[in-house]
Protein backbone atom coordinates (compact mmCIF):
# COMPACT_ATOMS: atom_id res chain seq x y z
CA UNK A 1 0.00 0.00 0.00
CA UNK A 2 3.06 2.26 -0.45
CA UNK A 3 3.21 2.93 3.30
CA UNK A 4 6.54 4.54 4.30
CA UNK A 5 7.96 3.76 0.86
CA UNK A 6 10.92 5.90 -0.22
CA UNK A 7 9.82 8.32 -2.95
CA UNK A 8 12.54 7.03 -5.27
CA UNK A 9 11.13 3.49 -5.24
CA UNK A 10 8.64 2.14 -7.74
CA UNK A 11 4.93 2.09 -6.95
CA UNK A 12 3.47 -0.70 -4.86
CA UNK A 13 1.07 -3.39 -6.06
CA UNK A 14 -2.18 -1.45 -5.56
CA UNK A 15 -0.91 1.72 -7.27
CA UNK A 16 0.63 -0.28 -10.13
CA UNK A 17 -2.62 -2.19 -10.72
CA UNK A 18 -4.66 1.02 -10.54
CA UNK A 19 -2.44 2.81 -13.09
CA UNK A 20 -2.74 -0.20 -15.43
CA UNK A 21 -6.54 -0.14 -15.16
CA UNK A 22 -6.64 -3.53 -13.42
CA UNK A 23 -9.35 -2.50 -10.98
CA UNK A 24 -12.79 -3.99 -10.41
CA UNK A 25 -15.20 -2.01 -8.24
CA UNK A 26 -17.65 -3.76 -5.93
CA UNK A 27 -20.64 -1.46 -5.48
CA UNK A 28 -23.59 -2.06 -3.17
CA UNK A 29 -25.86 -4.70 -4.67
CA UNK A 30 -23.21 -6.08 -7.07
CA UNK A 31 -22.75 -9.84 -7.41
CA UNK A 32 -19.44 -10.57 -5.67
CA UNK A 33 -19.05 -13.88 -7.51
CA UNK A 34 -19.22 -12.12 -10.89
CA UNK A 35 -16.84 -9.38 -9.74
CA UNK A 36 -14.26 -12.07 -8.97
CA UNK A 37 -14.88 -14.91 -11.43
CA UNK A 38 -16.78 -13.55 -14.47
CA UNK A 39 -15.34 -12.32 -17.79
CA UNK A 40 -15.05 -8.77 -16.46
CA UNK A 41 -13.95 -9.93 -13.00
CA UNK A 42 -10.69 -9.48 -11.17
CA UNK A 43 -9.22 -12.83 -12.32
CA UNK A 44 -9.97 -12.01 -15.98
CA UNK A 45 -8.13 -8.68 -15.67
CA UNK A 46 -4.93 -10.55 -14.83
CA UNK A 47 -5.43 -13.17 -17.53
CA UNK A 48 -5.93 -10.40 -20.11
CA UNK A 49 -2.39 -9.27 -19.28
CA UNK A 50 -1.04 -12.76 -19.98
CA UNK A 51 -0.60 -13.96 -16.40
CA UNK A 52 -2.14 -16.80 -14.40
CA UNK A 53 -3.47 -16.03 -10.96
CA UNK A 54 -1.70 -18.08 -8.29
CA UNK A 55 -2.86 -16.28 -5.16
CA UNK A 56 -5.20 -13.82 -3.52
CA UNK A 57 -4.82 -11.57 -0.51
CA UNK A 58 -7.83 -9.87 1.03
CA UNK A 59 -8.93 -7.78 3.95
CA UNK A 60 -10.26 -9.91 6.78
CA UNK A 61 -13.73 -8.40 6.22
CA UNK A 62 -13.87 -10.31 2.91
CA UNK A 63 -14.23 -13.59 4.82
CA UNK A 64 -17.80 -12.68 5.77
CA UNK A 65 -18.60 -11.63 2.20
CA UNK A 66 -17.24 -14.93 0.86
CA UNK A 67 -19.04 -17.01 3.49
CA UNK A 68 -22.26 -15.38 2.29
CA UNK A 69 -21.75 -16.48 -1.34
CA UNK A 70 -24.24 -19.13 -2.44
CA UNK A 71 -24.59 -21.18 -5.59
CA UNK A 72 -27.75 -21.23 -7.72
CA UNK A 73 -29.36 -23.79 -5.39
CA UNK A 74 -28.74 -21.67 -2.29
CA UNK A 75 -25.86 -23.73 -0.88
CA UNK A 76 -22.78 -21.92 0.40
CA UNK A 77 -19.81 -21.98 -1.97
CA UNK A 78 -17.32 -22.00 0.92
CA UNK A 79 -18.30 -24.91 3.14
CA UNK A 80 -17.11 -25.19 6.71
CA UNK A 81 -15.50 -28.36 7.97
CA UNK A 82 -16.22 -29.17 11.61
CA UNK A 83 -12.77 -30.72 12.12
CA UNK A 84 -10.58 -28.33 10.16
CA UNK A 85 -10.74 -24.63 9.46
CA UNK A 86 -12.19 -23.56 6.13
CA UNK A 87 -9.42 -23.16 3.60
CA UNK A 88 -10.32 -20.36 1.25
CA UNK A 89 -9.32 -20.57 -2.39
CA UNK A 90 -10.62 -18.96 -5.54
CA UNK A 91 -10.40 -20.74 -8.89
CA UNK A 92 -7.89 -23.16 -7.34
CA UNK A 93 -5.57 -20.47 -5.97
CA UNK A 94 -5.04 -19.99 -2.22
CA UNK A 95 -6.40 -16.97 -0.44
CA UNK A 96 -4.84 -15.28 2.59
CA UNK A 97 -6.31 -12.79 5.02
CA UNK A 98 -3.66 -10.77 6.88
CA UNK A 99 -4.97 -10.05 10.37
CA UNK A 100 -2.22 -7.72 11.55
CA UNK A 101 -3.87 -4.49 10.40
CA UNK A 102 -1.54 -4.07 7.42
CA UNK A 103 -4.27 -4.49 4.79
CA UNK A 104 -5.88 -1.14 3.94
CA UNK A 105 -9.45 -1.92 2.85
CA UNK A 106 -10.02 1.72 1.91
CA UNK A 107 -7.62 1.14 -1.01
CA UNK A 108 -8.44 -2.49 -1.87
CA UNK A 109 -10.68 -5.24 -0.55
CA UNK A 110 -8.68 -7.90 -2.37
CA UNK A 111 -5.47 -8.21 -4.37
CA UNK A 112 -5.23 -11.08 -6.84
CA UNK A 113 -2.37 -11.91 -9.10
CA UNK A 114 0.67 -13.85 -10.18
CA UNK A 115 2.68 -13.59 -6.99
CA UNK A 116 5.72 -15.10 -8.73
CA UNK A 117 5.99 -11.68 -10.41
CA UNK A 118 6.37 -9.93 -7.04
CA UNK A 119 10.01 -10.15 -6.05
CA UNK A 120 11.88 -8.80 -3.06
CA UNK A 121 15.46 -8.90 -1.94
CA UNK A 122 17.64 -7.79 0.93
CA UNK A 123 19.16 -4.50 -0.20
CA UNK A 124 21.46 -3.96 2.76
CA UNK A 125 23.20 -6.25 5.25
CA UNK A 126 21.17 -7.47 8.20
CA UNK A 127 22.60 -6.06 11.41
CA UNK A 128 22.25 -7.72 14.80
CA UNK A 129 22.78 -6.43 18.29
CA UNK A 130 22.55 -8.46 21.51
CA UNK A 131 21.46 -6.73 24.73
CA UNK A 132 21.83 -8.11 28.26
CA UNK A 133 20.89 -4.89 30.07
CA UNK A 134 18.06 -2.47 29.45
CA UNK A 135 14.29 -2.21 29.56
CA UNK A 136 11.64 -2.85 26.96
CA UNK A 137 8.75 -0.40 27.26
CA UNK A 138 5.15 -0.57 26.15
CA UNK A 139 3.70 2.30 24.13
CA UNK A 140 2.16 3.77 27.29
CA UNK A 141 5.60 4.00 28.93
CA UNK A 142 5.18 1.08 31.32
CA UNK A 143 8.05 -1.38 31.49
CA UNK A 144 7.30 -4.69 29.80
CA UNK A 145 10.68 -6.33 30.46
CA UNK A 146 13.68 -5.41 32.54
CA UNK A 147 16.40 -7.55 31.00
CA UNK A 148 18.78 -7.44 33.95
CA UNK A 149 16.16 -8.13 36.65
CA UNK A 150 14.61 -11.01 34.71
CA UNK A 151 17.96 -12.49 33.59
CA UNK A 152 16.93 -12.05 29.94
CA UNK A 153 18.61 -11.12 26.68
CA UNK A 154 17.17 -9.22 23.73
CA UNK A 155 18.19 -9.48 20.09
CA UNK A 156 17.63 -6.58 17.73
CA UNK A 157 17.81 -7.33 14.01
CA UNK A 158 17.52 -4.62 11.38
CA UNK A 159 17.07 -5.40 7.71
CA UNK A 160 16.20 -3.36 4.65
CA UNK A 161 14.22 -4.96 1.85
CA UNK A 162 13.48 -3.77 -1.64
CA UNK A 163 10.81 -4.98 -4.05
CA UNK A 164 10.08 -5.00 -7.74
CA UNK A 165 7.18 -6.03 -9.95
CA UNK A 166 8.67 -7.37 -13.17
CA UNK A 167 6.50 -6.70 -16.20
CA UNK A 168 7.95 -8.91 -18.93
CA UNK A 169 6.95 -8.39 -22.53
CA UNK A 170 4.24 -10.73 -23.79
CA UNK A 171 1.98 -10.88 -26.82
CA UNK A 172 -1.25 -10.85 -24.80
CA UNK A 173 -1.03 -7.17 -23.94
CA UNK A 174 1.78 -5.33 -25.69
CA UNK A 175 1.23 -1.96 -23.99
CA UNK A 176 3.38 -2.21 -20.85
CA UNK A 177 1.44 0.60 -19.15
CA UNK A 178 -1.77 -1.48 -19.35
CA UNK A 179 -0.15 -4.85 -18.54
CA UNK A 180 -0.06 -5.87 -14.87
CA UNK A 181 0.32 -9.22 -13.09
CA UNK A 182 -2.03 -7.99 -10.34
CA UNK A 183 -5.58 -6.66 -10.11
CA UNK A 184 -7.53 -5.22 -7.21
CA UNK A 185 -11.11 -5.41 -6.04
CA UNK A 186 -12.13 -2.19 -4.35
CA UNK A 187 -15.28 -0.97 -2.68
CA UNK A 188 -17.25 1.94 -4.03
CA UNK A 189 -19.20 3.00 -7.06
CA UNK A 190 -17.86 2.27 -10.54
CA UNK A 191 -16.40 5.25 -12.41
CA UNK A 192 -17.43 3.91 -15.82
Regions found by a protein language model. Name each.
Residues 1-44, 89, 96, 178, ...:
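Alpha-helical scaffold segments that mediate packing/assembly in large oligomeric complexes
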Residues 1-18, 45-57, 61-62, 95, ...:
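Long, contiguous amphipathic alpha-helices that act as assembly "spine/axial" helices in icosahedral shell
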Residues 72-192:
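Sequence/fold signature of self-assembling virion shell proteins
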Amino acid sequence: FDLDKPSTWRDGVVTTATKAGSVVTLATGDDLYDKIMAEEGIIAKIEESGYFVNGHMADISMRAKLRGLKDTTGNPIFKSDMQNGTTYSLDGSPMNFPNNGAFDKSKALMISGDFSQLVYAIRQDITFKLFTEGVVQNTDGSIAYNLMQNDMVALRAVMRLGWEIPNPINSMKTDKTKRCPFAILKAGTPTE
